[in-house]
Structures are given as C-alpha cells and as structure tokens.
Amino acid sequence: MSEKWFWLSDWAANMGIWEDDLVEASSESDHTFIAFEQLMKEPKNLYTSIAGLKSADCVVAWGFGSLCLMLSAKDRPAGQKWILLAPVYDFCDEDGGWSVRNVEMLSRQVTKAIKPTLESFLELMGSCDELIQEAWMETALKMNPETLASGLDFLCHNKIEEPLENKGETIVYFGREDQLILPVLAKKISTILPSAKLLERPKSGHWPHTLLL
C-alpha cells in the first residue's frame, strides 16, 4: 500500500504547481498538496481543517506551513514523519532579521502594491531555476492580497515557545544561502524540536527543490 504524503505550502505559495518535480522525493507515494490560502482557514488546527492529514505517513511543510504544522502539533499522530523545509518557529526572533514592525509594514503594503512586495521576498529566497521563480510569482499574484496580509500578520504574532513532544521522526532542511529564513534561525529550531535531524544545504536558498531534492 502506498504511503500518503501531504505538502504544506509557504506564505504566498502553492507547492502543487511543482508537483511533477516534488513527487520525486517519494515517487511511489500518494501526494496531496495544500496551498497557502487553504492553510489560512484554520492555521492552528490543521489536523482538523485538512481532511486526511491525520492519516498521512509523512508531512512536508515549507516555511509558513511548518509554523502552522508545529502550532497544530498537539494532534500529530504517533509515528507520523515530518520533513520541515526552511522552518519558521519564531519569524521575528532577534536573530532572524525581521522585526514585528517591518512585517506589519509589509502586511499593509501587500494590499496596495502586491507585486513589489512579492518581489522583495523573491530577492531573499536565493537562486533557483528561473521557471520555478516565475511560477511562484505568477501563482502568488493571483492570491487574495488580504489573505496574504493576514498571513504576514500571523507570522509575526505567532511562535512556538515550548519544546514539542517527540511523536515521530522529524527532519529539518535549511539552506545556507536562504536570506528569508536565515540559517542561524533555522538551526535554533533544535530548542523546539530537540530530537530533530538538521541538514544544511550549502548551495540552497529557500526553494523546496534545492532543499529537498
């Protein structure tokens, strides 16, 4: 019987647009991709709001998706594997390069000037195939600006403060060239997930393709 994999997207992203590439991580498995906008429906209760997530064998969560997943950790089934890509546990941590004030400013800005705001994030995500970057931008521009703003507000006002119970294997991938989630911040996730295996990708930025594949 095939394993079930769920993919939880980052802010302004839908990992499903890269399905053909990403399923290579486990080609024999059944894959379900959850877009950012779907995460925003109940970002602290993913196991309730996303049908089938509780029965998944593996959950891959990228950026914003990882924060939502960890905030929902009380409902994580025993033995469920997590793969966290450039995870966020405290976006405005003093070592992360973001302040609450800056993120709140971007939250206001994205509703008035969506493309310049997205471009400022794109610059921080590191190098990747140009077609991958173009697909991300094209998808993000179609999203509701108010939902994007709410996502930024959520990022700067929610964090994981206590270590999470070890219920299953957890692997963390982070990129040395990621300027959106700095490596120093990614490494600090060991305070929240002390049993997690941390893997640095020296030539990777923020993109799931270069982090995981």
Ranges and model annotations:
Residues 60-69:
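Gly/Ala-rich beta-loop-alpha elbow adjacent to hydrolase catalytic centers
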Residues 91-137:
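Helix-rich cap/lid subdomain of alpha/beta-hydrolase
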Residues 180, 198-213:
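Catalytic histidine-centered segment of alpha/beta-hydrolase-like enzymes
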Residues 1-44:
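Conserved HGGG/HGGXW glycine-rich cap/lid loop of the alpha/beta-hydrolase fold
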Residues 165-166, 172-174, 178:
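Short beta-strand/loop motif that positions the catalytic acidic residue
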Residues 16, 179-185:
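Conserved alpha/beta-hydrolase "acid-adjacent" motif
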Residues 74-109, 148-156, 212:
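Flexible "cap/lid" loop of the alpha/beta hydrolase fold
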Residues 134-161:
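Hydrophobic, aromatic-rich cap/lid helix
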